Regions:
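N-terminal [4Fe-4S]-dependent radical SAM core
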Residues: 1-72, 79
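Conserved AdoMet/S-adenosylmethionine-binding subsite of the radical SAM
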Residues: 55-212
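Conserved small/polar residues in nucleotide/adenosyl-binding loops
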Residues: 216-218
Length: 218
């Protein structure tokens, strides 16, 4: 767990899973992959295996050791709902979050279909916890907007959108049931441009729907 996160919208990170695979354009310049691959082959380093998927069960209980309440971004270096993570392991992560209820957990995924299926079924016990926020990444219309629909169909108490990197105008989209949104562009070498009018469009949609909006990397 990192107690001092550089991510603007959270306090800390917790990574019981490491590594991921690309599934959509938003993954192209993945900061987590870039960081992890720097240490591939470095013996003893947490990312000795680079960005290959790895379960880290020894990290599961870390939130219990952190007594001061924090906003905790779950799996900043992975995606909890990717296919290689077993249902049983996801359930174990959910049980920790439910018990460590002095923290507020932020769970973000691009695998929105699996999120919806599990939280509507065996993980329903975690879905309605007000201290667990469930979110999806949205970068464009083709891949991002369907994730919003999946999230809206998920029986969660708190739903949020990470609209970053914003790669095109999202047009008109429904924000019913969404509690918070973040919008931002890419940063670093090779960052793809984000147009001001795209951000204004998202801002206007949030204003009309009374959804709080955080702007980053503008």
């Amino acid at each position: 767990m990192s107690l001092n996160s550089n991510i603007e919208w959270t306090d800390a990170t917790w990574n019981p899973v490491r590594g991921c695979t690309k599934i959509s354009p938003g993954c192209k310049h993945c900061y987590a992959e870039t960081f992890a691959e720097r240490f591939r082959g470095v013996k003893g380093h947490p990312y000795e295996q680079g960005f290959d998927l790895r379960l880290v069960p020894e990290k599961l209980t870390e939130p219990f050791l952190w007594r001061s309440p924090k906003l905790v971004f779950v799996n900043s270096m992975s995606d909890l709902f990717q296919p290689g993570v077993p249902d049983d392991y996801i359930e174990a992560v959910c049980k920790v979050m439910v018990k460590a209820n002095w923290h507020t957990f932020q769970v973000l995924t691009k695998r929105s279909e699996r999120l919806r299926e599990l939280l509507s079924g065996r993980m329903r016990f975690a879905a309605k916890q007000e201290h667990i926020w469930w979110g999806v990444s949205v970068e464009d219309q083709k891949y991002g907007l369907p994730r919003i629909g999946d999230l809206q169909e998920t029986p969660a108490s708190v739903r949020f959108l990470s609209i970053e990197p914003l790669l095109e105008d999202l047009g008109a989209f429904d924000l019913s049931g969404i509690n918070w949104a973040i919008v931002g562009g890419e940063s670093g070498p090779g960052a793809r441009p984000m147009l001001e009018k795209w951000v204004i469009s998202v801002r206007d949609r949030c204003y009309e729907s009374r959804v709080p909006l955080s702007l980053i990397h503008i």
